[in-house]
Curated annotation (Swiss-Prot):
Binding-site list for ATP: G128, T129, H130, G131, K132, T133, T134
Enzyme class: ligase
Superkingdom classification of source: Bacteria
Similarity comment: Belongs to the MurCDEF family.
HAMAP family per the UniProt record, alphabetical: MurC
Phylogenetic placement of the source organism: Bacteria, Pseudomonadati, Pseudomonadota, Gammaproteobacteria, Alteromonadales
Gene for this chain: murC
Source species of the chain: Shewanella piezotolerans (strain WP3 / JCM 13877)
Compartment(s) of residence: Cytoplasm
Keyword match Aminoacyl-tRNA synthetase: no
Function: Cell wall formation.
Sample GO molecular function, one term: UDP-N-acetylmuramate-L-alanine ligase activity
Protein name (Swiss-Prot/TrEMBL): UDP-N-acetylmuramate--L-alanine ligase
Amino acid sequence: MSNKAEKYSQLRTMIPEMRRVKHIYFVGIGGAGMGGIAEVLVNEGYQLSGSDIAENTVTDRLSQLGAVIHIGHNADNVKDVDVVVVSTAISADNPELMAAKELRIPVVQRAEMLAELMRYRHGVAVAGTHGKTTTTSLIASVYGQADRDPTFVIGGLLNSAGTNARLGHSRYLIAEADESDASFLHLQPMVSVVTNIEADHMDTYGGDIEKLKNTFVDFIHNLPFYGVAVVCIDDPIVRELLPRFSRKVVTYGFGDDADVQAVGFTQTGYSSQFTVRRSGVADLNLSVNLPGEHNVLNALAAIAVASEDDIEDEAIIKALAEFQGIGRRFQQVGDFETAKGEVKLVDDYGHHPSEVAATIKAARQGWPERRLVMIYQPHRYSRTRDLYEDFVEVLSQVDCLLLLDVYAAGEAAIPGADSRALCRSIRVRGQLEPVFVASTEQLQTVLPEILQNGDLLLTQGAGNIGVLSRNLAQSNLGFNVKEAEEKNG
């Protein structure tokens, strides 16, 4: 056991029924969601091991904390463990999963393990199609500033903490709630946040938007009768569902009927300024180091949660003003001097049309004088197919577009739902001439020809484009193609 794990081992009493469990194994431990839960457990004192197909920053960190990491999946890895944790991304024929079932070792979903961590804590669960990671990070930052010392599990790197998960000493657990596979229904928090609801991951819901809506209603009703739902009333589906919520509801948004309302929004570069109005208390004049109206909504959610928990306004103001951002969420990579002049590079994870539209809007508001050049990598053929016309519409809004091939995420190709098809459809609209980039070698040739002095270059998507962005930065917007491909692997 590591010294750090030893330090926190007394907190295992927060899950008393798990005392029989000593060794926990994670299949696919390098994922952000899996790795975050694993980090909390290893710091609680559990013997922890796991496997993934390659090393990454998550596995490196867990190894430093005392976890045993296996590269590659092998049935022998699970023979001496007490429980195996998997995500829905793990296939049924995974050798470790098959061995665990043969040995009658309990196999639990990632969300079930998160639910156990939350069972004996005051849980704050953040759900929604967009904004979960940023909202969860903001809530965790406010609670940290207020000396509430929360445990948190976030789907992205919280820059101020240098990690996406942390074990706190208090009763609070702040975590993302994943609706992509409906696994958030395992959670039973004290506070549930819903940022918005849109059609995404529709294979989980049989392509039925009503089933998706009903699942969010069930999520709200997992709250105890004394729990609180904090929801964005600006979202049309959330507004539609409000009459069905039979729990206390606090709404937030820009609209006049919001319980927690933002007015007077302005943006200067990466910073947003606004005033918050709440019933019966003084207005708050705030600044948050995040661009765009969508991030003001995320901040409002954090303010609403904190206000319900009687956190002082001073802590809210300071936490938002000093917020250092999250990895790959409109992340300022740097300003670079190229042969053509100065170029600003920003990297963003958004991969749904609404997310891409919000990112473009924030870029236009913060840097209206700059030409917007986007390198976009579509994520999943099924999403590209299901939201094809929306993607064509939103991607046509940039000044210059380079399209990488679809990041399949394990899916088989779907005819007519690829980047070449998107290029053709965007070109037909006549607003811009998109460029399909078939390889990183081609990008190395094309990009210098396209960039101009003063451009804002935005790398956008949820696949391996973040690695590409880092390689661009490391070599002043030129990169080692072989190294990039090896890292992207």
